[in-house]
Amino acid sequence: MRASAIISVTLAGAIGISVTEAFAIEPRRIVHPGLLHTNDDFARIKGYVAAQASPQYDGWLKLAAAANADYTPNAQASVCRGSSDCTQNYASLYKDVAAAYANALVWRIRGTTDNAKAAVRIMDAWSSKLTEIIGSADRWLAAGLYGYQLANVAEILRDYDGWTGLDAAIKMLVDIFYPMNHDFLVRHNGASIDNYWANWDLCTLCAMHSIGVLSDNQTMVNEAITYFKTGSGMGALANAIWYIWSEEGSGKPLGQGQEAGRDQGHATLDFGLLGVLAQQSYNQGTDLFSLTSNRILAGSEYAFKYNVGQDVPFKTYTNNHGTATVISNSSRGTIRPIGELLYAHYNGVKGLNASWTGKYRDMVLDASDGAEGGGGSYGPNSGGYDQLGWGTILYRLD
């Protein structure tokens, strides 16, 4: 295990040295494994598998079938996302990391070393080859989405005795991904603060937080948490869920999301990412789920109520892209494997009314043969890989 954690500074790039050469910060105690999953989580999951308890066992069968121990990675030296002077190849990364995650989970739950070796093979291929992430502005999305996913795979594998590549994986994430995460939150690609929608900040925060935990860097973790609480970008909590309504009849809060007037594909993605950031933070002792009177729950209830076919109120929203006077019905009813995590925490752990989140979870399960799938289960394009998924076996409590 590393004796000290590494943090990036802009100065490092400016003077032409590696981020890992910039300076080190002594970490506080960070719990491992402690991103999306903890040891207690895996003990619970193993119990469900042993008991063949439904619907969790249905989720396990789906996950186990997806974990291909013979998977061959397609690592690239340069990942390109977005039209630019490069040829887009980022699908190689999101497909590989989804395969690594499934294999790492199956190893951790079932103990099969072939699955561990497959996940290691994928991680080592990327950490030994990747040098840059380039492309249009979409490169910032790649650094965020695939950064948090890679970090979660590495966090699971860190307990595998056969893996000698943890330091190399950390170096890749700290040297390549984190500087982009930090730069985006500071500069937003040189654009006005409301130019980039909430999901851009949120995936960036998920990556920054997860890389901080993986590398035992409390300063990096704090950077993500502080920005989420007080930042000026659209992914900060008060901006991501920017207006609170009172539901007619129940009186419970419904939080209008920043992307509600854009389309429901992105509006629901925001809550997948909010769930990731909150779950990772909760496992490190910081409860973002309850922040500002359970604001994430209010937003989840609003978004999912609309996406299961119910009407919600809408307040006119204006940003750099124009003015939305009505909620968007584009992609209404979109299917994402994100409801299990949010419902398990708010209803199962907190005992709160999360009825619309539960109905959305059930709608996704009805469309998914009874259990959430994962990367690749919901289409071959990047949107089908934005969330890691498999929530029925990983998060379901009842």
State where each predicted segment sits.
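Fungal secretory targeting signals
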Residues: 1-26
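Acidic, Ser/Thr-rich low-complexity linear motifs
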Residues: 135-139, 195, 242
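Amphipathic alpha-helical segments that form well-ordered structural scaffolds
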Residues: 149-150, 207, 273-276
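Extracellular glycan-targeting catalytic surfaces
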Residues: 23-190, 202, 229, 251-255, ...
